[in-house]
């Protein structure tokens, strides 16, 4: 009989060995039970409710209620655990049943043998298995050159798909290039197709024991046991307590006579009476001595059962009874009280190894039961003796990261790679050390002819000979002495470009270029054909354990087992004392080979191997694009003089050099013989005058000569006296505009303005040279965790978990009877691995297995041969503009522009949004070119661009090289089915079943031993750089797989550390000469060569520049006065002279205008009495001004002297002043309240509306720039709103066909004023206005307005203006061009879009229609509109016209 622990171990072993295989439904055996959608196997026990327990018996369900009355609970706080029926005491306080002792009842029959108990706790971890065989080949590697695949179909103008030509023969291998810096990380590639499954590896040896697990929760009750055999009779019990009084016994024997009584009085003798009644019993006498034992009486009838006596001491074990027949399974009994633990039995002998059973069919999936509450931990027991190694436990959580291991040894040198792509042109290297002097250069061309020597001193005058005849040309004279070198002439014009010189020697390798930006991800290529399996690689390190798989469905019920062992286990007893260690068992047979381990992760990169042998010569690469001009090198040493060169072609004549120094006086030549007379030469220039000859005799008087030519102009005569002033001339015509004045001096430097808004993105500059790599930045802060990755593939089924810790030792049980010999025991734990046995014979090949699941991807294959250069791919999408780089050095200051009108100084506002482009100023004169600025520091890297669109699907790649065939596996023939033996050792894990439903989350287990490495999951988003981990063990290289498609480019990786330099390889074959390098910097002048021989006479030089001015000649004699010149222009006004002395009084002027009537004067003196007459007027002052004045007697010539009492004159003066004041007052009033007339224009219509709110809308004159009113313009004022509306110069454009396209199907926007013949840009200002004046006034209007609007009406015939009714979109809508040259569209950014109030140009009807376009904006610089560009024009039947509305500012 097994103990309960053994029983649990058996169940645990069976659970670990179970292979989950998917079988068809028809394989499921009958005998199952179904209840509420759940299927139970035969003999399954379950509790549908806590107080109901059911059992499945060959398809029948039998249920019974659980009663709790037999075990009353005696504690104050009893509780019913979750899922249980009966109350229990929480921590053992109180008693769970009363301790009244009853009479011992009769012994019950032995119960039936119980079913197998629940699985026990998992054993400890086993030792780590041996490494598995190498995995199958990895996934295909990255693709090669995708350019040919991506180029098809992109060029819209190509005549068809360009088909690549046949591949040329592979050129000889070039020498290895320098290692480039690591390229950017590629984007994650799509998952490869699953590979074929790898061969199963050998089973590893048993692992080391894991640490003891936590005590498991109590298992559910086991199935009810079958009735046991009848036990032997128990020993006699102890004496019971006295029984209750029995019933009265039967009548006893007659007693002895009593003693005589005292003598009574003598009575009279009576007659003999009847016998009297018996007397009462006398008092009992004293007990007599004990008599002899009597004979044994007959057994009486059994009395009623007495109360239960105390338990007797155990008797000796009786002999075993015969085995009873197996009874039917009883209902589960109530849980019995826990018995004491019996002593450990001796170890049974080792049973034979059973044959491996066939895997059972999987049973239907059971419903997941509710998760029980975790029990409280028990008290820790005493330390037990070391147990035998348990079954390998489940992998624990990964341990803490170990310290980094030591650097692994350098790997063997890898095979030589193909030539790398040529790197980008490196930066110019540092100037080399001074070279050895080069060989002598070729002889230079002959120098310019020397200057003539000094003129010799004058010879003695010879006698004058008679003129001879002209002589023949003399032979060449003997060579003269060379003249001294003249100064070099000015530099000649540059010659034509010489032919390309021979290629220079190959330069040293430049530094690696910066890695390019990540390319667009290539399309997924077709899957290559799988390579044949490679040889087994070395075992990789164990991967991390995968997560526990979901529980598989229960298997089908097995064949009916033998009778079960003990019945239900009782509740958990208190922990017993630790038992003694058992003897060491016999070593078991070696276990079967374990499944292969998972491939390890790739090891850390080894150091670079030694340099490979030199490759063959590579084909000449295409010429690289010329690099940027390098900085000038340091000057080299002077070369040696060159060898004399061949005679060069005569150069262009140089300009005459400056005069050389005067030569030394030459030796006088020998006198030559007289030559024959030459032909008459041209008249020589007059010789210098000879010395005076002897005075001749006086000749005869000559005839008078003719009139000589006028002499040279004489010196100016002395200044004449001022003439009389001339009459006043007519007003001259307006002069032409003077030339621009010289630029004024630079003004004082202004205050630094606020930082302007960022300008618009410039056009992309040429790619700058790669800067040097910056120093590695500090490790960044840990990034936030990445997004949750895709769930990983289900891990392999975990191995069984470790067994729980030993429970407390139970109380000692009663000794049982010695049982019969038990069945063969479960196989013992595996002993230590034995020495390997001799190799068995190769078995016959087994039947072909089913196709395995796809294996993990193979390793990257060898790179294929480099393909031919494909046609260029299409341009990628433009990246987002980078941030503006820092400004260059300040250029030289331009010339000063024209002075603008002074603005009012405002408070400095905050920096506004970027202003509109200003009107194009007249260009300033070009300033001198500034020195090139030093390059600015590299700008901050822009944000990462969005991931590009995937490229086109690439062509199918070439198949990878087939790997060498693997060795055939050894597989024996399948043996005959043996009888069902005891469970064998743990088999290899089966194929993964389908994932079950996820279970409820369990309580966390204790920390396990570090698990094996898991297979790598799919790549997550790039995290921040973590701390560097320890290097993994290097994996064996896998067989090369086919080349896979290129992954997406990942984020650019950080620059890796430089590997150790390998030893230098042998020199490669000399390459073909490369393309000519960029022209080098000009070398320094060489040392002066030796003086060359005199060259041939050069050609006549070109006319030299005028020489420097000679020294002033002597003052000539004054010439005669010339005729008077024409009258000069009037001179500028002189400065004001000093005040002159007061002049004489002028003549009396003419009389002034008549004064106004004076006020009434004071009363005159009384007149003399008049003659009597009619009554006169009332007395009062008369105005004598109307009376004729007698002539004054004091007239004095023309002058007239006023007297203070001459009232008329005073009045005239007052009237004049008054008129002037009134005029000034009116002018001031006009300034304050302008009238909008041409003479008195307002500034804007808004001003007019504010001053004259009752005026009506109409045309008025305005002068926004104020100042002189000659440039005022006529506008329309809307007096309701205050808008100022400026009319166009030409308000309508005639309706006709304005444009016919050469290619009508190619629709594009065509600007009316810029492209169409006879078109023009729109101007504004109404009739008679100067467009230049209007533009200035519009500039001021825009400054004073906050809003502008304008309408344009587009008349159409068969031309779409806005909405295209056929397509329902705005693709054919017209474009408008604003004053600041910005384009205003129908759709897009709402700030640059116009609307329409009427749209009658939506389709081609052959009739005229119109669309009214309206644009309103707060960016006043965009209006007025100056051009329009329709798209739907170009055919002869498409016509349009335009009405241009006024532009209105508010």
UniProtKB/Swiss-Prot annotation:
Amino acid composition bias (Gly residues), ranges on this chain: 378-387, 471-480, 669-678, 702-711
PTM: Contains mostly 4-hydroxyproline. Proline residues at the third position of the tripeptide repeating unit (G-X-Y) are hydroxylated in some or all of the chains.
Bias (Pro residues): 130-140, 166-181, 317-331, 982-997, 1028-1043, 1120-1129, 1163-1178
Cysteines paired by S-S bonds: 1245-1277, 1285-1448, 1356-1401
A single GO molecular function term of this UniProt record: extracellular matrix structural constituent
Domain of life: Eukaryota
Keyword annotations of the record: Calcium, Collagen, Disulfide bond, Extracellular matrix, Glycoprotein, Hydroxylation, Metal-binding, Pyrrolidone carboxylic acid, Repeat, Secreted, Signal
Gene Ontology CC annotations of this record: collagen trimer; extracellular matrix; extracellular space
Location in or out of the cell: Secreted, Extracellular space, Extracellular matrix
Domain notes: The C-terminal propeptide, also known as COLFI domain, have crucial roles in tissue growth and repair by controlling both the intracellular assembly of procollagen molecules and the extracellular assembly of collagen fibrils. It binds a calcium ion which is essential for its function.
Description of how the protein assembles with itself and partners: Trimers of one alpha 2(I) and two alpha 1(I) chains.
Function: Type I collagen is a member of group I collagen (fibrillar forming collagen).
Protein name: Collagen alpha-1(I) chain
Chain's gene name: COL1A1
């Amino acid at each position: 009989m097994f103990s309960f622990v053994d029983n649990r171990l058996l169940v645990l072993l069976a659970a670990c060995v179970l292979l989950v295989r998917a079988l068809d439904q028809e394989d499921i055996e009958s005998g199952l039970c179904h209840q509420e959608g759940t299927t139970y196997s035969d003999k399954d026990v379950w509790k549908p409710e806590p107080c109901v327990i059911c059992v499945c018996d060959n398809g029948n369900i039998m249920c019974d209620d659980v009663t709790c009355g037999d075990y009353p609970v005696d504690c104050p706080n009893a509780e019913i655990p979750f899922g249980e029926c009966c109350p229990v005491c929480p921590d053992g306080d109180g008693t769970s049943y009363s301790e009244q002792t009853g009479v011992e009842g009769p012994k019950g029959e032995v119960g039936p043998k119980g079913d197998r108990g629940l699985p026990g706790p998992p054993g400890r971890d086993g030792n780590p298995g041996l490494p598995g065989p190498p995995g199958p080949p990895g996934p295909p590697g990255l693709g090669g050159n995708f350019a040919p695949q991506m180029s098809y179909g992109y060029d819209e103008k190509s005549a068809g798909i360009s088909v690549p030509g046949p591949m040329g023969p592979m050129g000889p291998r070039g020498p290895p290039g320098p290692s480039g810096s690591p390229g950017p990380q590629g984007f994650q590639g799509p998952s490869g197709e699953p590979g074929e499954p790898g061969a199963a590896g050998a089973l590893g040896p048993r692992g080391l024991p894991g640490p003891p697990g936590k005590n498991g929760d109590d298992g559910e009750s086991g199935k009810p046991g079958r009735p046991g055999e009848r036990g032997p009779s128990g020993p006699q019990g102890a004496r019971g307590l006295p029984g209750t009084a029995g019933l009265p016994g039967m009548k006893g024997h007659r007693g002895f006579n009593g003693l005589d009584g005292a003598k009574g009085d003598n009575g009279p003798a009576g007659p003999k009476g009847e016998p009297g009644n018996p007397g009462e019993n006398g008092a009992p006498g004293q007990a007599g001595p004990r008599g002899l034992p009597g004979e044994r009486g007959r057994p009486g009838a059994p009395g009623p059962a007495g109360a239960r006596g105390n338990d007797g001491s155990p008797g000796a074990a009786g002999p075993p009874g015969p085995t009873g027949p197996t009874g039917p399974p009883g209902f589960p009994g109530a849980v019995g009280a826990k018995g004491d633990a019996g002593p450990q039995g001796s170890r049974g002998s080792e049973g034979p190894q059973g044959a491996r059973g066939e895997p059972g069919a999987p049973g239907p999936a059971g419903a997941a039961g509710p998760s029980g509450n975790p029990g409280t931990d028990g008290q820790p027991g005493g330390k037990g003796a070391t147990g035998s190694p348990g079954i390998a436990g489940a992998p624990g959580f990964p341990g803490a990261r170990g310290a980094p291991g030591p650097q692994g040894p350098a790997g063997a040198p890898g095979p030589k790679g193909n030539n790398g792509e040529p790197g980008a042109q490196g930066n110019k290297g540092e100037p080399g050390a001074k070279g050895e002097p080069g060989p002598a250069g070729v002889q230079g061309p002959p120098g310019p002819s020397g200057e003539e020597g000094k003129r010799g001193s004058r010879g003695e005058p010879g006698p004058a000979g008679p003129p001879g005849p002209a002589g023949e040309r003399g032979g060449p004279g003997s060579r003269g002495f060379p003249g001294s070198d003249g100064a070099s002439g000015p530099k000649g014009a540059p010659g034509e470009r010489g032919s390309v010189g021979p290629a220079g020697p190959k330069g040293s390798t430049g530094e690696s270029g910066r890695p390019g930006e990540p390319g667009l991800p290539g399309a997924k290529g077709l899957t290559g054909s799988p390579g044949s399996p490679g040889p087994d690689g070395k075992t990789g390190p164990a991967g991390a354990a995968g997560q526990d798989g979901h529980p598989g469905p229960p298997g089908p019920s097995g064949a009916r087992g033998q009778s079960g062992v003990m019945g239900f286990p009782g509740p958990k007893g208190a922990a017993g004392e630790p038992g003694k260690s058992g003897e060491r068992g016999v070593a078991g047979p070696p276990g079967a080979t374990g499944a292969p381990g998972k491939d390890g992760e790739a090891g850390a990169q080894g150091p670079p191997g030694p340099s490979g042998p030199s490759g063959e010569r590579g084909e000449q690469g295409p010429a690289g694009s010329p690099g940027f001009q390098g900085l000038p090198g340091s000057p080299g040493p002077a070369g040696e003089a060159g060898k004399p060169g061949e005679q060069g072609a005569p150069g262009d004549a140089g300009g005459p050099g400056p005069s050389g120094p005067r030569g030394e006086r030459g030796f006088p030549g020998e006198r030559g013989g007289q030559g024959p007379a030459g032909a008459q030469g041209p008249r020589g220039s007059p010789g210098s005058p000879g010395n005076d000859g002897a005075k001749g005799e006086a000749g005869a008087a000559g005839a008078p000569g003719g009139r000589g030519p006028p002499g040279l102009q004489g010196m100016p005569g002395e200044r004449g006296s001022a003439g009389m002033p001339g009459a006043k001339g007519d007003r001259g015509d307006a002069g032409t505009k003077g030339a621009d004045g010289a630029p004024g001096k630079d003004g004082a430097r202004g205050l630094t303005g606020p930082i302007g808004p960022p300008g618009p993105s410039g056009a992309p500059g040429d790619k700058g040279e790669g800067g040097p790599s910056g120093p590695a930045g500090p490790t960044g802060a840990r990034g936030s965790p990445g997004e949750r990755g895709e769930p990983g593939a289900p891990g392999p089924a975990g191995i069984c978990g470790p067994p729980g810790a030993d429970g407390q030792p139970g109380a000692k049980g009663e000794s049982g009877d010695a049982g019969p010999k038990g069945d063969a025991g479960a196989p013992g734990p595996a002993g230590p691995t034995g020495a390997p046995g001799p190799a068995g014979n190769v078995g016959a090949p087994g039947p072909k297995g089913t196709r395995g699941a796809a294996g993990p991807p193979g390793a990257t294959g060898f790179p294929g041969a480099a393909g031919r250069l494909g046609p260029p791919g299409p341009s990628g999408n433009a990246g987002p503009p980078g941030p503006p780089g820092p400004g260059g050095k300040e250029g030289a200051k331009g010339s000063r522009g024209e002075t603008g009108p002074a603005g009012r100084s405002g408070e400095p506002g905050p920096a506004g949004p970027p202003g509109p482009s200003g009107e194009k100023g007249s260009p300033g004169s070009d300033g001198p070119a500034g020195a090139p600025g030093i390059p600015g520091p590299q700008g901050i890297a822009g944000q990462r661009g969005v991931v590009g669109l995937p490229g086109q699907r690439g062509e199918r790649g070439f198949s990878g090289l087939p790997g060498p065939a693997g060795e055939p596996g050894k597989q024996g023939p399948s043996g005959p089915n043996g009888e069902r033996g005891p469970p064998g050792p743990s088999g290899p894990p089966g194929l993964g079943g389908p994932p079950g439903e996820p279970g409820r989350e369990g309580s966390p287990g204790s920390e396990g031993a570090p698990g094996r490495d898991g297979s790598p999951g799919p790549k997550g988003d790039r995290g921040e750089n973590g701390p560097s981990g320890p290097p993994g063990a290097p994996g064996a290289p896998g067989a090369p797989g086919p080349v896979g498609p290129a992954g997406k480019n990942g984020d650019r990786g950080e620059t890796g550390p430089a590997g150790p330099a390998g030893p230098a390889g042998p020199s490669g074959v000399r390459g073909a000469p490369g393309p000519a390098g960029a022209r080098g910097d000009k070398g320094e002048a060489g040392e002066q060569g030796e003086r060359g021989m005199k060259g041939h006479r050069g050609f006549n030089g070109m006319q030299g520049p005028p020489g420097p001015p000679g020294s002033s000649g002597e003052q000539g004699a004054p010439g005669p006065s010339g005729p008077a010149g024409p009258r000069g222009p009037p001179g500028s006004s002189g400065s004001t002279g000093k005040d002159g002395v007061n002049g004489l009084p002028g003549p009396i002027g003419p009389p002034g205008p008549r004064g106004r009537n004076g006020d009434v004067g004071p009363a005159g003196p009384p007149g003399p009495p008049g003659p009597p007459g009619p009554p006169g007027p009332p007395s009062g002052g008369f105005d004598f001004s109307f009376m004729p004045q007698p002539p004054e007697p004091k007239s004095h010539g023309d002058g007239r002297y006023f007297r203070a009492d001459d009232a008329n004159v005073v009045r005239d003066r007052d009237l004049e002043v008054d008129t002037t004041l009134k005029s000034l007052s009116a002018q001031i009033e006009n300034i304050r309240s302008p009238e909008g007339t041409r003479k008195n224009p307002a500034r804007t219509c808004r001003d007019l509306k504010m001053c004259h709110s009752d005026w009506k809308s109409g045309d008025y004159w305005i002068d926004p720039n104020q100042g002189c009113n000659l440039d005022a313009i006529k506008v329309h004022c809307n007096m309701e709103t205050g808008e100022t509306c400026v009319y166009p110069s030409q308000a309508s454009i005639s309706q006709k066909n304005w444009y016919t396209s050469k290619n009508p199907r190619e629709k594009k926007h065509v600007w009316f004023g810029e492209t169409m013949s006879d078109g023009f840009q729109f101007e504004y200002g109404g009739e008679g206005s100067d467009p230049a004046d209007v533009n200035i006034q519009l500039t001021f209007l825009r400054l004073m307005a906050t809003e502008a609007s304008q309408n344009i009406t587009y008349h159409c015939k068969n031309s779409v203006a806005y909405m295209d009714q056929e397509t329902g979109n705005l693709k054919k809508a017209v474009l408008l061009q604003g004053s600041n040259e910005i384009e205003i569209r129908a759709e897009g950014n709402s700030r640059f879009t116009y609307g329409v109030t009427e749209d009658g140009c939506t389709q081609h009807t052959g009739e005229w229609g119109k669309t009214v376009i309206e644009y309103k904006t707060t960016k006043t610089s965009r209006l007025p509109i100056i051009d329009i560009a329709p798209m739907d024009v170009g055919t002869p039947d498409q016509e349009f016209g335009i009405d241009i509305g006024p532009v209105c500012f508010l």
